[in-house]
Amino acid sequence: MKIKVITSYKPGTWTEYAKRAVDSVLLNWPADTEVVVYHEAQQQDIFAHERVTFIDIHEAQPELVKFKERHKNDPVANGELQEIPNGVKRAGSGPNAVGKGSFIWDAVRFSNKVFCVTHAIKNSDTHDYVIWLDADTYTFRPMPKEFLIKLMPTDSMLTYLGRVNPGLNDGGKDPECGFVGYNLRHPEIQNYNTDWENMYIQDKVFDLKLGWTDCSTLWHLSKIYVKDKNVKVNDIGRWKGVKGHHVFINSELGLYMDHFKGKRKKAGASAKQDFKQQTLDETKDIQNLDYWKKAPTNL
């Protein structure tokens, strides 16, 4: 299995946490893992390594630039409430849509991530998998390739961290997308990729009723592919009932990685309180690892 890990970072966050994430992949992932770091007109020579490539996403994806230009002055498309003439409107009527601005509706902000992924999928012919990693992740010990092979089945188009509670039957919550594996050998992946880009090129993202983040559009489209094309997806989150929906470290990924989600960025670690009782054989030993024994109890 040949893997390309991709990530991106906001201006000013390279030294804060993104460099640490990239360093940890180079140190602890299989030695043939390639890394692509997407950026926005930032200095490209801040980091040199034979397995790392920097790509200016605005140069690589002109349709992203067009989308952001179309909607940059529309408060609603940027997560706020104030509507403007001929602007977009929230289609949702649920709890995420009511009464306040929210990142959940910031389509402009999260479009960057989508176009990073779609660029990588279109330009990785010699690879078997593209894996998206958020820049605030950290790989704390060596990860054998066998782990990744087992984690991402060849018959699944996507491997992701689901957060749906099957007992509620309420439409659920979209995935946690700090880690997503895209199977480049799957016969539908390029069609999926084109459809995902077209949600932004054709402004269809604004038709969604639960949110406009990258997680929202990924989940929306993957459900269509599962239903209409009988595509398999691999949910390694399995909804674990975790406070704050921090499924990342409660999945098998917690055996090797941490995700500094939200306030954890400042702390530089997740906390022991982020774990729930492990009942799966794959994850029962996570909290016995030295890294997690040293983690703060709470934040």
Q: What are these model-predicted stretches?
A:
Residues 1-95, 99, 122-126, 184, ...:
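N-terminal anchoring/stem segment of glycosyltransferases
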Residues 14, 44-47, 63-64, 139-142, ...:
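Short catalytic/ligand-binding loop motif for oxyanion handling, primarily in non-cytosolic enzymes
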Residues 16-19, 111-115, 212-220:
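A structural signal for well-ordered alpha-helical segments within the folded catalytic domains
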Residues 95-105, 204:
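Short glycine/proline- and acidic residue-enriched helix-loop micro-motifs
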Residues 105, 109-161:
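GT-A fold catalytic core of metal-dependent nucleotide-sugar glycosyltransferases
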Residues 113, 133, 175-178, 214:
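Residues that flank catalytic or metal-binding motifs in active/ligand-binding sites
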Residues 140-206, 211:
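Conserved catalytic core of nucleotide-sugar-dependent glycosyltransferases
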Residues 179-299:
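Catalytic core and acceptor-binding pocket of nucleotide-sugar-dependent glycosyltransferases
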